[in-house]
From Swiss-Prot:
Coiled coil spans: none
Protein's UniProt name: 4-diphosphocytidyl-2-C-methyl-D-erythritol kinase
Role: Catalyzes the phosphorylation of the position 2 hydroxy group of 4-diphosphocytidyl-2C-methyl-D-erythritol.
Keywords: ATP-binding, Isoprene biosynthesis, Kinase, Nucleotide-binding, Transferase
One GO biological process term: terpenoid biosynthetic process
Organism: Acinetobacter baumannii (strain ATCC 17978 / DSM 105126 / CIP 53.77 / LMG 1025 / NCDC KC755 / 5377)
Length: 277
């Protein structure tokens, strides 16, 4: 039995800079890993199948964990059936990358457990087929991202704490992308520019999320009283960096929805994962 953490991420900003002919959007963002974890347990079983426990009514063929395992199966030198249990702490549909992280964790663990012998780069190439956020969790380092999110430049970020709010709504990414008022032509920028004035960098999805989802608007207004609230991903989660002036316990206590205090990570706990021999 192997039990490992599967971390979440924040988008410290998110700009859409263009659109490809295939419909995919070009973007720029910073991925910040945080210490909010799902926990995944991998247990070999005698049956030649993948069993998944803990994700409710998600159909197996649509499950990113199952799909990750199926991608690796042809490369397995020592295949075995598995019971995979997931303990969810990262809210779903929140912009925190929980599903992508779970897929990446599955690729990392099974690459060793099944003796696939694939490199980190090969795992990332498989991962991007499952979702644009998956490679960041494969590499397990904070990064400046471009393209559809798959072109990564690893960066060193200061240690910080964040208050994260999860409004009681599920945001449709497709709905936000379909809005004609979505800004799709942000001017490309650089990490150096971000470092000089991070408060100038927002999220192109934020105005739409606030307009279409009153719960997001309420959470943003609440956090804006204490700091600079931002949307992560396409939402629904919003966050603000903790400052010395904040009474964190009081902010968490009176939040209008589920609230978390999280810490930034320099790297994923899976960065140096090894299956015990």
């Amino acid at each position: 039995m192997i039990r490992v953490p599967s971390p979440a991420k924040l988008n410290l900003f998110l700009h859409i800079t263009g659109r490809r002919e295939n419909g995919y959007h070009e973007l720029q963002t910073i991925f910040q890993l945080i210490d909010l974890y799902d926990w995944m347990t991998f247990t070999p079983i005698s049956e030649d199948e993948i069993q998944i426990e803990g994700l409710g009514e998600v159909q197996l063929e649509q499950n990113l964990i199952y799909r990750a395992a199926q991608i690796l199966r042809p490369h397995a030198q020592n295949p075995c059936g598995l019971h995979i249990k997931i303990e969810k702490n990262i809210p779903m549909g929140a912009g925190l990358g929980g599903g992508s992280s779970n897929a990446a964790t599955t690729l990392i663990v099974l690459n060793q457990l099944w003796q696939c012998g694939l490199t980190e780069e090969q795992l990332a190439q498989f991962g991007v087929k499952l979702g644009a956020d998956v490679p960041i969790f494969i590499y397990g380092l904070n990064a400046w991202a471009e393209g559809i999110g798959e072109h990564l430049s690893f960066i060193d970020l200061d240690q910080k704490q964040f208050i994260v709010l999860k409004p009681d709504c599920f945001i449709s990414t497709q709905l936000l992308f379909s809005q004609k008022t979505l800004t799709r032509d942000s001017k490309p920028t650089t990490f150096c520019a971000y470092q000089l004035e991070p408060s100038n960098f927002g999220n192109n999805f934020e105005p739409l999320a606030r307009e279409l989802y009153p719960e997001v608007e309420e959470a943003m207004q609440y956090l804006d009283q204490f700091g600079h609230a931002k949307l992560t991903g396409t939402g629904a989660c919003v966050f603000a960096e903790v400052t010395d002036e904040m009474n964190v316990d009081d902010i968490l206590k009176h939040a209008p929805c589920k609230a978390y205090l999280v810490h930034s990570l320099k790297e994923s706990p899976l960065r140096h994962f090894k299956v015990a021999s």
